[in-house]
């Protein structure tokens, strides 16, 4: 909608007419005429302002088939092999791959990406075992670790009672999800995660990490400021922040449960 606002414009001389007129109009109508941005100072609706790049959006997954990543994403797993992954020590990842997914192999250890990431958008899909034999934290347990450090819990939380900060979509030991959006055991589920890394100055954290998480399309972590680490120390203790590199690998956890993963991709984000 375009709305016309009538206001007087003081003429200050030809050389500064535009700037002065803009200043008076801003003051008169209590509005904004110029915007200070990362790419410079721009007039509102300025056609010379840089346009965003054009990409091809991805496609949605179904229970039977994984979707496709957007064209500007870094694909970490497309269902064919583990060429983008290693063990924690850097050896070949030993999880199995079949029918378009990877599956945790008990006692083979966590796996990590060969590439390192900081702030990012992450899409990942998972399925806990369809056959339920355990309860609480022993039921479909795994984890998605941003920067190999900050965990979004993976767990079968469908009709499965456990401590709230350890259920599915929790920031482990730190933040309880807004709702329990779990599907039934064996069904494919998704996380869409917006993560901004912590920033350190020496041994001090000067900006804490933030998480926004959608679980099966439902907002469950709303720009949560992570108050510290998520590594388990004992029953009632998790770690504090510890300085680390600006970029680190993504890690998936082997918690002795045959959890499956598919359609994993990431888009790197600029630090603000």
List the model feature ranges, each with a label.
Residues 1-12:
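Bacterial N-terminal signal peptides that target proteins for export
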Residues 20-272:
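Carbohydrate-interacting regions of secretory-pathway proteins
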């Amino acid at each position: 909608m375009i709305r016309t606002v009538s206001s007087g414009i003081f003429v200050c001389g030809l050389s500064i007419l535009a700037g002065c007129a803009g200043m008076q109009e801003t003051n008169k109508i209590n509005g904004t005429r110029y915007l200070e941005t990362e790419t410079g100072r721009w007039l509102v609706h300025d056609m010379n302002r840089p346009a965003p790049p054009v990409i091809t959006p991805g496609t949605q997954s179904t229970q039977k088939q994984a979707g496709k990543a957007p064209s500007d994403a870094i694909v970490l797993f497309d269902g064919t092999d583990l060429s983008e992954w290693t063990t924690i020590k850097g050896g070949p990842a030993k999880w199995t791959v079949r029918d378009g997914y990877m599956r945790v192999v008990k006692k083979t250890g966590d796996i990590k990406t060969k590439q390192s990431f900081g702030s990012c958008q992450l899409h990942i899909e998972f399925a806990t075992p369809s056959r339920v034999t355990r309860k609480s934290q022993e039921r479909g347990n795994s984890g998605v670790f941003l920067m190999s450090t900050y965990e979004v819990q993976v767990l079968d939380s469908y009709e499965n009672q456990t401590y709230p900060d350890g259920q599915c979509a929790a920031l482990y030991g730190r933040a309880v999800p807004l709702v329990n959006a779990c599907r039934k055991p064996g069904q494919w589920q998704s996380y869409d995660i917006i993560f901004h890394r912590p920033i350190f100055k020496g041994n001090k954290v000067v900006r804490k990490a933030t998480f926004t998480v959608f679980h099966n399309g439902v907002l469950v972590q709303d720009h949560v400021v992570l108050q510290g680490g998520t590594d388990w120390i004992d029953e009632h203790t998790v770690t504090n922040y510890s300085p680390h590199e600006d970029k680190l690998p993504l890690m998936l956890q082997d918690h002795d449960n045959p959890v499956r993963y598919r359609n994993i991709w990431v888009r790197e984000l600029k630090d603000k």
